[in-house]
Amino acid sequence: MFQDNPLLAQLKQQLHSQTPRAEGVVKATEKGFGFLEVDAQKSYFIPPPQMKKVMHGDRIVAVIHTEKERESAEPEELIEPFLTRFVGKVQGKNDRLSIVPDHPLLKDAIPCRAARGVQHEFKEGDWAVAEMRRHPLKGDRSFYADLTQYITFADDHFVPWWVTLARHNLEKEAPNGVATEMLDEGLERQDLTALNFVTIDSASTEDMDDALYAEELADGRLQLTVAIADPTAWIAEGSKLDNAAKIRAFTNYLPGFNIPMLPRELSDDLCSLRANEVRPALACRMIIAADGTIDDDIAFFAATIESKAKLVYDNVSDWLENNGTWQPENEGIAQQIRLLHRICLSRSEWRHHHALVFKDRPDYRFVLGEKGEVLDIVAEPRRIANRIVEESMIAANLCAARVLRDKLGFGIYNVHTGFDPANADALAALLKTHGLHVDAEEVLTLEGFCKLRRELDAQPSGFLDSRIRRFQSFAEISTEPGPHFGLGLEAYATWTSPIRKYGDMINHRLLKAVIKGEAIARPQEDITQQMAERRRLNRMAERDVGDWLYARFLNDKAGTNTRFAAEIIDVSRGGMRVRLVDNGAIAFIPAPFLHAVRDELVCSQENGTVQIKGETVYKVTDVIDVTIAEVRMETRSIIARPAA
């Protein structure tokens, strides 16, 4: 008699609409219970039995119950699952398999089976890619996944690389394909093979894409010719090789090895500007005044060059600093180094006054054994030879940005607009509390941004600089010319690494159209999105492999008294993150290691400080001594404590 009763249906509807609900993200804990985080201020308790229906990171709608003034959440509807495609370790044997996701907060094994078409017989410890198929909030009894790809076996020494590449769905090897002959591009190439071009790189570099040649003019000004490898002389737009490069967008540099954007035959040989080999190149000639100003008369042209020497950063730096035994092989090469050094000094001086110069940070290089074991981690400071190349490349990219803007009105530009306008007032208020007075409008201009950066660089520590970083916008890739506030330049378009950046290949094609005086279509917007996404994934992959190798390297230091100098890079409610100065490893210091009495401790992310009993004891950019308390290999996390 109650069936199809409209009154009953109405009552049900009423009860449903009156029950309080909340949407948020599930945060798991190691103790079985969890929280529904609605926003930064509000969260609801999820009891252990209800946590069985959800997973850490799921976005859900939950019913809010109140019992004895205590609120709790009952998951009701799945908005967006946290896990879709993931990597993990297989447990069990073929008949009863499960997989534990490789994630610090996901500990539960998920029942699974090999997807149709996957031939591998999975066994305990195998690494695999899986895709979620069932979820309790979708009406299923439990979680369930399909194993869609075998990655590698448990004891493979190269697990960090293969698992990371699979996690981010990135290629494991160089693209296939060969280029048999150069294209007829209708370009007249200037023969510069007699000139003393040199390359300066790391000793191990094979994909040399820039060569430099300098000469002094009669009036004392210096003329710099930057010759860049020319892969678009071999690769036609829209060809199979071009499409593969477009998808990869960049060469992926990981500790120990790289996965090139182009076939190795091209990247390391045919296009690489090897010493004493004749190569096609795209070149830019510019004249630099004594004060570092680049003359408006910039020439781009196609050329043929022959590098006369493969120079190595450390050798060139030692020679310029009068150290070591290395000598240039002849006076012609020595003269090149001297002239390039002069160009570097004048351009650096110009950028200090008219643009911005980054503070030098060392590069950290992993020294690996045959089996991927970390033998050492070496901090490689940026020396004078690195700066010679850097200044030449920045000058060349500035020239390309101007030429593309003035001749075409588009290109592949690196754009950075400084501070987000929405943050300008908060930024000015924060700076005021530290005694720096800026105009909220002016700081949004290139000139105002540069002025502020110079004031910050003059501060005794980088503390204030670290505080305002959160107000900055991110650098973007755009087809529209625009300023690069981070470099302090009116426009910046890279074309100097076409072997390893697809955007630079596009700019080569655009510059060639300018050289020939031909019209050319504007690049599609979707290519900039692909490049930005690939850059993000490659950076995450580099960080993930690095975390794994750092954990391996520091594992035997856990629980010892070995001290490391560490810079505080971030403070959060739970403690602080530090970077070990000698090797670049990131470690976490939990709040209880800072002070035993929680009520007397205030860790403020907002202020970047740690206060104990009202006194600021630590702040971001401080360098302190730490010891390694623990290394958690399963999550690749390093726990440190302040040294006693």
Swiss-Prot record:
Main localisation: cytoplasm
Keywords: Cytoplasm, Exonuclease, Hydrolase, Nuclease, RNA-binding
GO molecular function: exoribonuclease II activity; RNA binding
Annotated GO biological process: mRNA catabolic process
Presence of keyword tRNA processing: no
Entry EC no(s): 3.1.13.1
Catalytic activity: Exonucleolytic cleavage in the 3'- to 5'-direction to yield nucleoside 5'-phosphates
General function of this protein: Involved in mRNA degradation. Hydrolyzes single-stranded polyribonucleotides processively in the 3' to 5' direction.
Name of the protein in its database record: Exoribonuclease 2
Gene name in the database record: rnb
